[in-house]
Amino acid sequence: MVLDPTQKKSVIDAHAKHEGDTGSPEVQVALLTARIEDLTGHFKEHKKDFHSRTGLLKLVGRRRNILNYLKKTDVQRYRALIEKLGLRK
C-alpha cells in the first residue's frame, strides 16, 4: 500500500542526513520498511492476496539490495540503520 504524504514526510525527517535528503540509502530503506510493515498488516486481514504478496517480495528484495550496498560502502552506517529500524535480531 502507499504511504500518505504525512507518514512519508515523518519517515524522511527521521532518517535524513541533511535538509532535503530523500535519496540517501538510509531514507530509502526507512521508506521501504514503512511500506513493508504496512503491507504486512494488510496480509493479516487478506491472507489470499497473492498479487500484493509478489509486490511485497519485490519491496523486500529492493530493501535487501540497498542494505547490501550500504554494508559494502559504509559498515558503520549500515549497523546504525539496522539498529535504528530494528531489522535484525
Curated annotation (Swiss-Prot):
One of its GO terms (biological process) is translation. SUPFAM superfamilies: S15/NS1 RNA-binding domain (SSF47060). Keywords: Ribonucleoprotein, Ribosomal protein, RNA-binding, rRNA-binding. The keyword rRNA-binding applies. The keyword Nucleotide-binding does not apply. Residues 1-24 are annotated as: Disordered. InterPro entries: Ribosomal_uS15 (IPR000589), Ribosomal_uS15_bac-type (IPR005290), uS15_NS1_RNA-bd_sf (IPR009068). Residues 1-21 have a biased composition (Basic and acidic residues). One of its GO terms (cellular component) is cytosolic small ribosomal subunit. It comes from the Bacteria. GO terms for molecular function: rRNA binding; structural constituent of ribosome. One of the primary rRNA binding proteins, it binds directly to 16S rRNA where it helps nucleate assembly of the platform of the 30S subunit by binding and bridging several RNA helices of the 16S rRNA. Part of the 30S ribosomal subunit. Forms a bridge to the 50S subunit in the 70S ribosome, contacting the 23S rRNA. NCBIfam families: S15_bact (TIGR00952). Belongs to the universal ribosomal protein uS15 family. This is Small ribosomal subunit protein uS15. It comes from Desulfovibrio desulfuricans (strain ATCC 27774 / DSM 6949 / MB).
